[in-house]
């Protein structure tokens, strides 16, 4: 597992770094996509080389289909995920115009990049929760869920709060000199970041359901989320445009988050829903306070590369300090358990 996690993390980090360099040196969507595609092409090549070097595979062994008896439920889950990922662009393409799609795509490049970084950072944790569930060790499982939730909240609220402050200035830099449409869309940028954050905070509970082989039980909620997203987006896109489709995504993500927190409380003895919502409330208050403080004390108005970097450093220090204070005051057990986990 560490080879996969390490490779994925490096690819994502290099993708973000090279994308930033490309934006400042030669801002072209074609170059950006070429860099991204080239880096991700390396991933299967690295895995293939590692497997051939370290494992002997007998390709003549008869398949055991009982091992994938839940495959159609898995297909349904992935179909729902595909609908989630493509709804906004599809609705905008058919019911808005290509200029609006262009705005969405540029902002989405940033939010998706941050999401990939967080996914890569978390990829090595999910299997530990699955191991504890398989052993039916509820005390260990609750401890690991606590630390999993804590790490997710720290990463999501730190990175996405900073992103919410910087995404629109970044897009203004990226699209400087382009006058075909108005790329300065701060409210849309904020709501897009919020929707991605809501998608990520449920990951501990979603991955627990996957590990527990509960694909059938979570299929219907996945489709309800997709339906809410589509219906609300279609209803609001004509009047609100980008904001409308983002509201649809936020409503769908909120429903799915609430369901998975509830479902975890049903399959894990002693796992009260308030544990999650307490973390959500505290980190949301801290992130909100940090956002307001940064926005008021040091707003980024005259955007240059230098000012963007200076503000990014300032925002990281402020948001990081607030979240650290919240951790010290309210989550000492999680911090200690995480330190022990790292040492092991």
Q: Where are the model-predicted features located?
A:
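Short runs within selected transmembrane alpha-helices of multi-pass transporters and secretion channels
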Residues: 7-19, 32-48, 77, 81, ...
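Interfacial segments at transmembrane-helix termini and the short loops linking adjacent helices
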Residues: 166-196, 303
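Interfacial transmembrane-helix starts/ends
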Residues: 68, 137-154, 158-166, 183-189, ...
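Interfacial/gating helices of multi-pass transporter permease domains
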Residues: 29, 66-74, 92-112, 140, ...
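Helix-loop junctions and terminal segments of transmembrane helices
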Residues: 111-149, 205-211
């Amino acid at each position: 597992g560490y080879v996969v996690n390490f490779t994925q993390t490096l690819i994502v980090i290099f993708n973000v770094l090279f994308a930033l360099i490309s934006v400042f040196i030669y801002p072209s969507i074609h170059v950006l996509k070429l860099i991204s595609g080239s880096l991700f092409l390396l991933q299967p090549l690295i895995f293939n080389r590692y497997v051939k070097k370290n494992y002997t595979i007998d390709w003549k062994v008869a398949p055991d289909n009982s091992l994938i008896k839940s495959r159609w439920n898995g297909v349904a889950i992935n179909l729902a995920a595909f609908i989630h990922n493509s709804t906004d662009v599809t609705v905008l393409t058919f019911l808005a115009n290509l200029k609006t799609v262009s705005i969405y795509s540029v902002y989405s490049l940033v939010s998706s990049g941050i999401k990939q970084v967080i996914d890569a950072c978390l990829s090595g944790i999910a299997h530990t929760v699955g191991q504890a569930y398989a052993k039916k060790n509820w005390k260990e499982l609750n401890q690991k869920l606590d630390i999993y939730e804590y790490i997710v909240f720290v990463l999501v609220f730190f990175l996405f709060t900073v992103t919410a402050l910087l995404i629109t200035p970044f897009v203004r830099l990226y699209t400087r000199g382009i006058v075909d449409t108005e790329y300065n869309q701060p409210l849309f940028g904020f709501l897009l970041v919020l929707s991605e954050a809501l998608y990520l905070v449920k990951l501990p509970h979603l991955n627990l359901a996957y590990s527990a082989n509960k694909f059938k039980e979570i299929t219907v909620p996945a489709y309800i989320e997709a339906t809410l997203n589509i219906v609300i987006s279609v209803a609001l896109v004509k009047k609100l445009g980008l904001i409308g489709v983002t509201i649809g995504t936020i409503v769908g993500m909120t429903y799915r988050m609430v369901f998975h927190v509830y479902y975890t409380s049903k399959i894990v003895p002693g796992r009260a829903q308030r544990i999650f919502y307490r973390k959500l409330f505290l980190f949301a208050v801290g992130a909100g306070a940090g956002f307001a403080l940064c926005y008021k004390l040091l707003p980024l108005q005259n955007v240059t590369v230098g000012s963007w970097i200076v503000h990014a450093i300032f925002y990281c220090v402020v948001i990081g300090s607030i979240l650290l204070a919240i951790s010290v005051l309210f989550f000492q057990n999680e911090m200690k358990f995480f330190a022990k986990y790292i040492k092991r």
